[in-house]
């Protein structure tokens, strides 16, 4: 309950009231009489309530009878007027100075905005040092798998260019480095790192405010730089554990892309290539780790044309997610099949089941050895990556399509799941311990975790141990979210795929996107 009190103005010294003045002047006959009357008036001072009401007090101690008869607590006869507190009903306001408050808020917000803007430029150099010393050091081993076009040292020249980009991109990158640092320290078990949290939210607020200002300009709403800004916020949300708000940002980007003509219209753009590549992958992965009831045709329609997707995605299989394009295309088909199963009135069960078995056959026919032969270096790593993703994709195909009754829950498919689970359990430890491949193993690890509901406690223990270590190693909270989801699933007693995920989850480890080619309108 809220309480409000009405307070009087300044305290004032005792002054003779108009009643006292009349009494004094009517009775005064000489200077001596006047003095005597004034002394008597001081001795018989009216209580403060009688003064306020302009009535004659009866001077009773400790409180006058007139106040008592009126049902009022007598405030007494002191030299200083006591504060008068008046009870008001909750929510009731007697007065409000709109102009003063508004002016105060404007001055305050302007001061904060100015101070924040002034604080950004010096922090850019701190971000540069942190990125080169820590984040770049973590990313550099990926070059051993093949030259990564989006991983590079931030030189002084690039730093000067960064100062010229919109404020929301600069602050967004600072947020990424701060978040990386917090996760490396294990912020949840390190209360001493609260200063990093404060800095993070200061720059996060700057990012949101700056992007909102850009978005409010009509001719800039659908620009490349706004898409880059929203994607930066989206990746920040995912890095921070993927609370519910991240999905709104994903939907927002899809709407902007639609306003620009759709993915097919934007795909040829080289400057948008890293952004669209990132967005495609997040969209596909998100549609795997969600209930079928959350699948959205407007999202999946961007990915259902596998030939088109492979054409524009294959160039990034090495530098971005290490997900073999052929398998990713099958994942896209599975997503679309789950959507069809959700509305069975348009499709026959036999037709869906036949498609599902064809997809599973294509997945298991994928050859990691042949895929690795096309790589120029680290062929053993590439074979292991292909093997891990083949088994993870096969598990996704069987478990998710059984959940929507497209595939049967028979012993033959259960045996296949056991085999693929054993393959993951055999190859994931080495993949997670390698600096070259560890950041690409979250989705396969989640798949093993879902399959672990059918297996022994040792598999669950392995998954539960690896996810926090992956979070600290890579500098993102999303593995901790995966740990929470899987442990809740194991404890639920349920076993179907859709029962594991209460909402969409973006189990991807990418924390930033290359915006160096994005043009500012």
From Swiss-Prot:
DNA-binding region(s), chain positions: 46-76
Main localization, broad class: nucleus
GO BP field: positive regulation of transcription by RNA polymerase II
Gene disruption phenotype: Leads to reduced expression of genes for the polyketide synthase PKS2, the cytochrome P450 monooxygenase P450, the alcohol dehydrogenase/quinone reductase YogA, the lipid transport exporter superfamily member RTA1 and the a major facilitator superfamily transporter MFS, as well as a marked reduction in phomenoic acid production.
Keyword RNA-binding: no
Superkingdom of source: Eukaryota
Subcellular localization(s) per the UniProt record: Nucleus
UniProt entry tagged with the keyword Transcription: yes
Cellular-component GO terms for this entry: nucleus
Leader peptide range in chain numbering: none
Function (record text): Transcriptional regulator; part of the gene cluster that mediates the biosynthesis of phomenoic acid, a long chain aliphatic carboxylic acid that does not appear to be essential for pathogenicity but may play a role in allowing to outcompete other fungi in the environmental niche via its antifungal properties. Positively regulates the expression of the cluster and subsequent production of phomenoic acid.
Protein name: Phomenoic acid biosynthesis cluster-specific transcriptional regulator
Organism: Leptosphaeria maculans (strain JN3 / isolate v23.1.3 / race Av1-4-5-6-7-8)
Gene giving rise to this polypeptide: C6TF
